């Protein structure tokens, strides 16, 4: 009985698999946290998500990262290109948001430089941070993003593509290698409003 409970009736075998299944079955609302970034004054994340009525694909990163964050940036560059090449109807748009979990270092100016380096189009892809450390921790905890300082000024962290709806709820989690699936799901959700 314990194995059945731990694996959601033998549907998943990892903690990440369990997270994905749990989110798909029960969307997770973002906590009350504020974000800021280049062109984004301090504002509630939930309000920003709801403001444009669009579906948002989110990743978590930090600008000093020289490993997985660069891969995530490359994935978002490809997703941005696809969004530019295949625009959707107004009101059914998808956008991208990179959130730094290193808010004390990643100031809006540093995020702006990083965005320029990646060729981010601010109409489609924005960068932000959660300026309050306690709020950042609450957001990471709620969305089950694991970030561990490595003792050398860097971080070990999991990486995924998180799809959030216009109500500010995490509705799906995709592996970084599933970028096409994540974007197609986000577009479907934007067009139909159904998870």
Predicted regions and their residues:
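N-terminal targeting signals for export/organelle localization
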Residues: 1-36, 192-195
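Short loop/turn microsegments at loop-to-beta-strand junctions
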Residues: 30-31, 55-56, 158-160
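Short, acidic, Ser/Thr-enriched surface-loop or helix-capping motifs
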Residues: 37-39, 164-165
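Generic structural signal for well-ordered beta-strand positions
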Residues: 43-46, 171-172
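Short active-site neighborhood of thiol/selenol oxidoreductases, capturing the structured segment around
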Residues: 45-76
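Structural microenvironment flanking redox-active thiols in thiol-disulfide oxidoreductases
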Residues: 72-139
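Structural micro-motif
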Residues: 123-125, 137, 141-150, 154-162
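Thiol-/selenol-based redox modules, centered on thioredoxin-like
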Residues: 150-195
